[in-house]
Amino acid sequence: SAPDSAIERVRAASHCCAWSIALEAFGRSRGRGAPIGYATRTRRRVAGLEIWGAGMAQKMKAAVVHEFGKPLVIEEVAVPEVPPGQVLVKVVASGVCHTDLHAAEGDWPVKPALPFIPGHEGVGHVARVGAGVKFLKEGDRVGVPWLHTTCGHCEHCMGGWETLCDSQQMTGYTVNGGYADYVLADPAYVGRLPDALEFAPAAPLLCAGVTVYKGLKVLDCKPGDWVAVSGVGGLGHMAVQYAKAMGFHVIAVDVADDKLALAKTLGAELTLNAATQDVVAEVQRHIRGAHGVLVTAVSRAAFTQALGMLHKRGTMSLVGIPPGSFELPIFDVVLNAKTVRGSIVGTRLDLLEALQFGAEGKVASHYSTDKIENINTIFDAMRAGKIDGRVVLQM
């Protein structure tokens, strides 16, 4: 089938990258990457691309967080010196994620060390290769995702759940990220971009794309099953497309009619407005419950609603992180054998597969482009909930 072909193609190149986040790991992995200032190099040309060779010092533009809750400062800092085992990536485009806003606000339990450069959806080409790097070369097209590196030898890393590693380092949080002209990366954790995928469309796949794709995978649904996507925003509109490409019948749930109309054009067969309809009753009436529900909405009410939408033996996957907690009706869960799962971004293999769906035209983010100089205005719009889809910075 088409979904199988996409996955099999990427598994043939499974040394490429992905990443993820566990909030619990924030307190255990606070090592920093290189500081903001570095020694730098002169430019030369390879295959029509500007890269860096040995020579005089150079500067790069970056958006820097100096104080939590204050505007980012657009300034010139030194281009990083490349240590052994790492690569320097020339950033062409960088997606803006709500996690970047949380990092800049410092409103998560463990905060980044100041100052730092946010951004974990940077895409570009390898500008310089550190000593000992064997499988990447200058000019290679890559993405630098959230998961900067892990220990590689704990039970989670060895068991295919590297996103749960207690020693993980995170791009744009514990190490400097992609809101800059250049960013350092671990070559084992970058995502190799398929040739058919342009830079700007690839950027949102590094976080939003792989997050919803992994969330759908852990539902353990099969082609032909009914899957509901709760929340059709920056993540949800991509989830509808991934679900359709994976062979599922898709239900879209939101509180905004315009987002539901978009979901319909993206392949949703049933759309429901949670503000005006009894979503649980409608899903049970139409299909006797969904086999899986992916919750991207940052809403505790959506979590409870998702459980009610499930078919017997159904699974709900949670990727949204609203504050607080939600009640779990034990009687319903036990008697109907329902499963509740959290899902944390995705592994390197998950990212590889997510990018391939994009390369084959099965998934495309709805995004607008902007300049790094406008990052504070973008964050203001994000706080106000005025951003549709995603924003990609053109560097």
Residue ranges and their predicted role:
Residues 142, 195-282:
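Mid-domain Rossmann-like dinucleotide-binding core that forms the NAD(H)/NADP(H) cofactor-binding site
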Residues 219, 251, 255-257, 261-339:
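Glycine-rich cofactor phosphate-binding loops and adjacent beta1-alpha1 units
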Residues 16-17:
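Cysteine-centered motifs
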Residues 50-123, 185, 394:
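Short N-terminal strand-loop motif that marks the start
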Residues 35-55:
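Short, Lys/Arg-enriched N-terminal segments with co-localized hydrophobic residues
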Residues 52, 57-58, 257, 304-308, ...:
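C-terminal hydrophobic helical "lid"/dimerization subdomain
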Residues 111, 149-230, 265:
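NAD(P)H dinucleotide-binding glycine-rich loop of Rossmann-like/cofactor-binding domains
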Residues 80-94, 107-155, 189, 194-200:
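Glycine-rich beta-strand-centered segment in the early N-terminal region that forms part
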